[in-house]
Amino acid sequence: MTDAPAHTRERVTISEVARVAGVSKATVSRYIGGDRQLLAEATAKRLEEVIERLGYRPNQMARGLKRGQTRLIGMLVADILNPYSVAVMHGVETACRQHGYSLVVCNTNRDDEQERHHLVALQSYNVEGLIVNTLGHHPGELLNLQRDIPMVLVDRQLPELNVDLVGLDNADAVEQALDHLQAQGYRDILAVSEPLDGTSSRLERVQAFGASISRRPGMRQQVLEIGAGLQGQLASFLAHSGHGPQAIFTFNGVATLAVTRALLEAGRNLVADVGLIALDDLDWYPLVGKGITALAQPTERIGVAAFESLLGRLRGDSGAARRIDFKANLIIRGSTQPQ
C-alpha cells in the first residue's frame, strides 16, 4: 500500500511531533524556534529524527504572528506591466531575500478601487513594512497604515506622507538630456509625457524641462501628454520646423513606445526627420534604427535602496524622512546623431 500523495495528507501538527518524540509541545517549540542549544543533545537528536520521519513543516506564518513578525514586506505598484515597476520590484525582491524577508506584491492596475482593496488586504497579511509605487489616490488609507507600519515611497512623492522617498534626480536627468541635445545642434524640443495626473516625478520633469530651456537662448520647447491625438500632435510639431533641428524628449518608457509607434506609422525617419532621446532605457531601444539615445535609471539600485531604507526603519531608525535620489546614466545611440 502506497503512501497518500503529499497534497492529500493531513498536515502534521506540533502535538503529533511531541507525542511521537515523547516530549512536551513547549520542547518542540524551543527546537524549531532556534533554541536547540537549550535542549539536551539526546532530546534534540530525537526531535530531529521524528520531524524528518513525519515530514513536519512548521507554520511560519502562525509562528510569525505569535512573535509579531511575519517577515513579509508588502509592495504596492500602480502598473505591473510598466518596465520601470518590474525592474524596481526585482531590486526590492532581491534585497528582501538577502535579508530573510518575502515580498508580497499588489498591482492596482491604475484602478483606485483596486488600490483600496489591496491596502486592506496588505493589513490582513500583517506585512511588517510597505513599499509604495502607486498613484496614491487614497492618502487617508495610506496615512492610517503608516501609523502602524514603516513605509517607503518609490519614484512618487505623496505630500500627505512624511516618509522616505527613493527615486531619480529628475532635474539632473533633464539637464543631461538637454545638454546633449543642445550639443548635437537641436534647437526645437518637444517633451512627451504620460498624463501628469498629479504624479510628482512627471511634474518634476516637466518643471525642470521648462526651467532648463528658459536658460538656453535660441532653444524652443513644447510639452504634450500622450493620448488619442498623439500622431496628429507630432505631425503638427514636425510641420513647424522653422526654428531649427527638432528633437523629441520622452519622459518614460511608455511615452517612448507611443512616440516611436506613432512616428513609424507616419513613415517618419527617426534621424533624418527628428531626433529622439528617452528617459528610461529599455531592451528594445537598441533595435530601433541605429538605437534610441537614453537616460538609464538605476532601477535595481533604486529597489534595493527602497528596501534598505525600510529595513532601517524596521530596526528602529526614527530620524527625519529622507529623499534618496539616484543619477541617470546617458547612453548615446544613433537617434541623436543628426546626418
Swiss-Prot record:
This is HTH-type transcriptional regulator PtxS. InterPro entries: HTH_LacI, Lambda_DNA-bd_dom_sf, Peripla_BP/Lac1_sug-bd_dom, Peripla_BP_I. GO terms for cellular component: protein-DNA complex. PROSITE patterns: HTH_LACI_1 (PS00356), HTH_LACI_2 (PS50932). Contains an N-terminal helix-turn-helix DNA-binding domain and a C-terminal domain that binds the effector. Pfam families: LacI, Peripla_BP_1. Negatively regulates glucose metabolism by binding directly to the promoter region of the kgu and gad operons. It also negatively regulates its own synthesis. The gene is ptxS. It comes from Pseudomonas putida (strain ATCC 47054 / DSM 6125 / CFBP 8728 / NCIMB 11950 / KT2440). Induction: Negatively autoregulates its own synthesis by binding to a specific operator site within the ptxS upstream region. Homodimer in solution. Residues 12-67 form the HTH lacI-type domain. GO terms for molecular function: DNA-binding transcription repressor activity; identical protein binding; transcription cis-regulatory region binding. It comes from the Bacteria. Residues 14-33 bind DNA. The keyword Coiled coil does not apply. 2-ketogluconate acts as a molecular effector and causes dissociation of PtxS from its target promoter.
